[in-house]
Amino acid sequence: MPKSKCVPLKVTAHLVDGRFSSTDGIVMLDSILYHAWFIKHAPHVLEGVYKPEQIGYVGLPLVHLEDNRWAASKAVYQEIDKIVEHYNKRPDFFAGDKLDYLDMDKGIISDSVGLYRAYRNPQLIRTVKDGILTFYAVGKKDKIEELLSLMIGVGKKTAMGFGIVDRWDVEEIEEDYTTEHPKYGLMRPIEVEKADKTYDYPIMDYAIRPPYWKTINQRLCYVPVG
């Protein structure tokens, strides 16, 4: 079977109820595919069993750019609602530090202090028109479809039911919109010192490749929020 080639693609996520959880509103396609790669090739890492010798090169089916970046965009969508919801995080009463917070008179362990204290956490829930998130990429269509089939949701707190995907559509297009789009503007964080022009976007430390939470991947970037 001949190898598939990298082509410009439009990727559409159809959400079940149109809601997903994200603080800054940025959802990156390469981050989704990165997570899917580990589901397929290294599930033990997601289970907390990290063995460096079992992790080789993480090869996503995307064009590989300089600085180990991938040719993939953020999601674009029409936001129609935005609310703050809260979730409660239970304390771990069996944590080693809990005896330090035992009230000897009452015989009660405080759940509001300590490393594993209880939390009431806010999260920003966004609702998008028609439940559609659109991404752009340059990569191998069949391989991307294969990885996306493993991803049931996008954004944070999918276990709570946010960002659940009903289906993924991947289609070939003519142009590469992974960096800029004529309608939507900048399509991913771009390093300030490597940008070929000035952008009217906030400048902040932001990751340029997945995993986006990892400090080592952060650079001073133009970030297309809002």
Kindly give the residue locations of the regions a language model identified.
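RNA-interacting cores
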Residues: M1-G226
